[in-house]
Amino acid sequence: MCGLSAGARNGGRRLELELVPRPGARRLLPQVPPHPHVTFCSHSTDFEVHRNWLAITHNLPLSQWYYEATSEWTLDYPPFFAWFEYALSHIAKYFDPKMLVIENLNYTSPATIFFQRFSVIFTDLLFIYAVRECCRCVNGKRAAKDILEKPTFILAVLLMWNFGLLIVDHIHFQYNGFLFGLMLLSVARLCQKRYLEGALLFAVLLHFKHIYVYVAPAYGIYLLRSYCFTASNADGSAKWRSFSFLRITLLGLIVCLVSALSLGPFIVLGQLPQVISRLFPFKRGLCHAYWAPNFWALYSAVDKALTVIGLKYNFLDPTKIPKASMTGGLVQEFQHTVLPSVTPLATLICTFISILPSVFCLWFKPQGPRGFLQCLVLCALSSFMFGWHVHEKAILLAILPLSLLSVQRAKDAGIYLILTTTGHFSLFPLLFTAPELPIKILLMLLFSVYSFSSLKSLYRREKPLLNWLETIYLIHLVPLEIFCEIVFPLTPWKLRFPFVPLLLTSVYCAVGIMYAWLKLYISVLSERTSARQKAE
Amino acid sequence: MEKWSLMTITVLLALTVRWTVSLGSYSGAGKPPMYGDYEAQRHWQEVTYNLPIRQWYFNTSDNNLLYWGLDYPPLTAYHSFLCAYVAKLINPDWIALHTSRGYESQSHKLFMRTTVFVADLLIYIPAVILYCCSLKETSTKKKVSSALCILLYPGLILIDHGHFQYNSVSLGFALWGVLCLSYDWDLLGSAAFCLALNYKQMELYHSLPFFCYLLGKCFKKGLKGKGLLLLIKLAGTVVASFAVCWLPFCTDVEQIMQVLRRLFPIDRGLFEDKVANIWCSLSVLIKIKNVVSPQTQLKLSFAVTFLSLLPTCIKLTVQPSLRGFKLTLVSCALSFFLFSFQVHEKSILLVSVPVCLIINEVPFMATWFLLVSTFSMLPLLLKDGLLLPYAVTTLAFLSACVASFAIFEKTSAKDLQLKPFSQSLRGYVSWFKLFPKIVRSLFLLSVTLMGVLSVMSAAVHPPQRFPDLFPVSVSSISCLHFLFFLVYFNVIILWDSKNSRNQKKVS
């Protein structure tokens, strides 16, 4: 349905989008339980989270939004998102008023499911619009005759059929579609040199979901460097004279106004500390229940391996080891046994240090929108690698903007293929019931086959996108999946070590994502020197 | 992009749609005491696994034929037996004799859905892909888009993966038959078609075109030489494949007779429920079932069916061509559907699949027909709670067809293969200039009508005086469409020869 309206609205680009298989059509399907008897597809806790927020914002006054705690899923998104839920709740009451009762925990009537699922599909319209705007920014130098080989078409499919976004939003249940829509739209506006609009959109986005603060450095520096400085020196450094106070005031004004609109009421009520404490829950532990495939997953895995080895050769005293770390393996509060335990401050410092080079790059040799996008992806990836309590879904923050780069340069396309394949694979544990197994495998194959073959045909004349090592690494995801989902549950270890499949998935994917991150970093940094040499 | 990756994407897309539809409801879910086709299939597994073959088709103390007795040919029974074997390995409760009646659970549903999915993947989908690859004089893109449209055809998906049946098996075998015939592997083709026939007796709808085409081919080769040899070979193949399928039942004539009685239950009446065929639609005006005796009904329907089949079959026998064969498959199946005895609403699938085969030749008409055929099953789908899958798959199918064939630009007489017909009429009728526009607006009108009726039957309560208002109007409107299509297909078949001769002259 979304696809239909996109096709109708797009006029000139109509054919292109129409050939894109409509996501809406399929997105609607997995959640069709017309009969309570056959409510088949599971919905995650996030479904209940959002139902609860609908109820909270609908029934309570503003002053209690961030205090209400009947459900364990308290409101922990910024105020704009709460307002969004408030608006939705006024439509929801026409579907099933019972879902708006705060005490109705885990309430799932067919009408509730229909409404919630449909609200995600409907808000996806913004995402589709943003994709269209992004496609306009991609320069069509390679104007292929065949529509299937046009970069804009490929980009549209890569974004709209993004496996991660599809399963996280439409099966697992979240509202990432329109949030990423806002982000892509702001990127598109920056590419079109409509800086103020882009800044406004991003500021609004930040107050919808604060996870986007990870990429804020890229926005800040880019706006400062390319918008506030109106001219550059010949060697690419900023011309200090050209600094425009008017422009920075405008930017500041936008940010302040948006923040005032969002946080103002809570400041007046004196609830800012409470809001902040809800938004940044540092009590939650280094890793999420399932380790996101980042640096800390590798760190924890090494720690675990060392513990096992230590116990075997009697280097460690078994009585001193915290029990949880050996049995559960994936508990929330994770104590490392051999390696030093990690504090939130340490992760913050690591994140900061890892972001720094990319930001410097953006400042010292701005390459226009391309450089900005590279910096954006690097920021997202770095914070994914080193952040505190990172969710596996956060990888989408890097994958989606990287799609824009992948259709413009072969080198980025190679990195994109590694990152998406491993990143999407790491989302597999999100869907764990048997009926969802075929869906996730089919959708993943669909996206992977498309991304590989389309990018390969786009860069037909250049050298292969992946070298042999990368190819072998990616191919081995197949046996890994077969082992984790089919072989392992049949073995007797299933009961004793239930965490092994998750551990394997997370560690294996962490290697790939780490590699993609390093490769992208190296390519960005080395590009600088070569560009500088050329300039000299 | 390369052909194989496009085809892979098409297949994956088709599989995804199939699986997502299968997550929905099925026929008779949670509706004791009879449940629906889902329970029928499960019951057959139970019966075939637990009883000796001799008792499968007989009413015994362990096999109550009134409760979903087996009424399909042996291959269906073997298939059930095979599935039951797997079921036994997973959970013996699913097929326990007597106690498993009406068994429903999430894991059982998953199992049943998987059996359909696997059957579809192994038989129907490869046939479609190979068929599309074998299309001559078409670009890669056209081949892929034909495959996409055929695989996304909502009717078959909704009935097999939603309502719950194994039509893709018999239709898949029939497709393999067509495929083999198009490569001139006549023996293999007829063997494949025999398998289809032994899976579902409804495949008889397709048997005449197969017969006429092969017979015509024998005639063409000369009945005294090669033709006779081919005829003997074909007859041998058919007899042999039937014998293999029926081997366990050949012990006793009574066995065979009982199976046949089960397969052709002539006492069940002219039609059931609300079928979009001529008898059901006529009974809105005249209650045929009450006016005419059952024996006369049988004779009447037979006579009308036979008469409507005759012209195209004769034509095919006299001038056997692959194109004519496909078209005759359509028109014969449609005649059977409209006029024959004891037709189900699902039998329209037997017409739809041949129509799928000509989707790249007459995309506009094929799309239109496929939409109508899905719409004609709406009352059934509503009963099963498949409204949402129906709406979404239909819209997806329509947009896939519009995008890949640009159907709205292909409405001229030439695109509809009506050129010879219009030439023969020239002089009498002068409105042919307006023809494309008229056809297009008819299509839009019909699509709007179908949309409105779909929405109304889903959302509006019928007036108390006419509780069946919507099902009846759905079936009558579909029936009118089908009559129109029957005329259309007959016209293009019968006027085909001039066209091909002209083409030959040109070349």
Curated annotation (Swiss-Prot), chain B:
Record membrane topology: Multi-pass membrane protein
Record carries keyword Transmembrane: yes
Molecular-function annotations in GO: dolichyl pyrophosphate Man9GlcNAc2 alpha-1,3-glucosyltransferase activity
Keyword flag Metal-binding: no
Residues the record marks as carrying a glycan: 59
EC supergroup of this enzyme: transferase
Listed pathway(s): Protein modification; protein glycosylation
Record topology, Lumenal segments: 25-114, 165-168, 248-297, 360-361, 409-441, 495-507
Subcellular location: Endoplasmic reticulum membrane
Pfam families named among the record's database cross-references: Alg6_Alg8 (PF03155)
Keywords: Endoplasmic reticulum, Glycoprotein, Glycosyltransferase, Membrane, Transferase, Transmembrane, Transmembrane helix
An example Gene Ontology biological process: protein N-linked glycosylation
First and last residue of the signal peptide: none
Record topological domains on the Cytoplasmic side: 1-3, 136-143, 190-226, 319-338, 383-387, 463-473
Catalytic activity: an alpha-D-Man-(1->2)-alpha-D-Man-(1->2)-alpha-D-Man-(1->3)-[alpha-D-Man-(1->2)-alpha-D-Man-(1->3)-[alpha-D-Man-(1->2)-alpha-D-Man-(1->6)]-alpha-D-Man-(1->6)]-beta-D-Man-(1->4)-beta-D-GlcNAc-(1->4)-alpha-D-GlcNAc-diphospho-di-trans,poly-cis-dolichol + a di-trans,poly-cis-dolichyl beta-D-glucosyl phosphate = an alpha-D-Glc-(1->3)-alpha-D-Man-(1->2)-alpha-D-Man-(1->2)-alpha-D-Man-(1->3)-[alpha-D-Man-(1->2)-alpha-D-Man-(1->3)-[alpha-D-Man-(1->2)-alpha-D-Man-(1->6)]-alpha-D-Man-(1->6)]-beta-D-Man-(1->4)-beta-D-GlcNAc-(1->4)-alpha-D-GlcNAc-diphospho-di-trans,poly-cis-dolichol + a di-trans,poly-cis-dolichyl phosphate + H(+)
Annotated transmembrane regions: 4-24, 115-135, 144-164, 169-189, 227-247, 298-318, 339-359, 362-382, 388-408, 442-462, 474-494
Family the entry assigns: Belongs to the ALG6/ALG8 glucosyltransferase family.
Coiled coil: none
Protein name: Dolichyl pyrophosphate Man9GlcNAc2 alpha-1,3-glucosyltransferase
EC number: 2.4.1.267
Top-level taxon: Eukaryota
Job of this protein: Dolichyl pyrophosphate Man9GlcNAc2 alpha-1,3-glucosyltransferase that operates in the biosynthetic pathway of dolichol-linked oligosaccharides, the glycan precursors employed in protein asparagine (N)-glycosylation. The assembly of dolichol-linked oligosaccharides begins on the cytosolic side of the endoplasmic reticulum membrane and finishes in its lumen. The sequential addition of sugars to dolichol pyrophosphate produces dolichol-linked oligosaccharides containing fourteen sugars, including two GlcNAcs, nine mannoses and three glucoses.
Listed GO CC annotations: endoplasmic reticulum membrane
Native organism: Gallus gallus (Chicken)
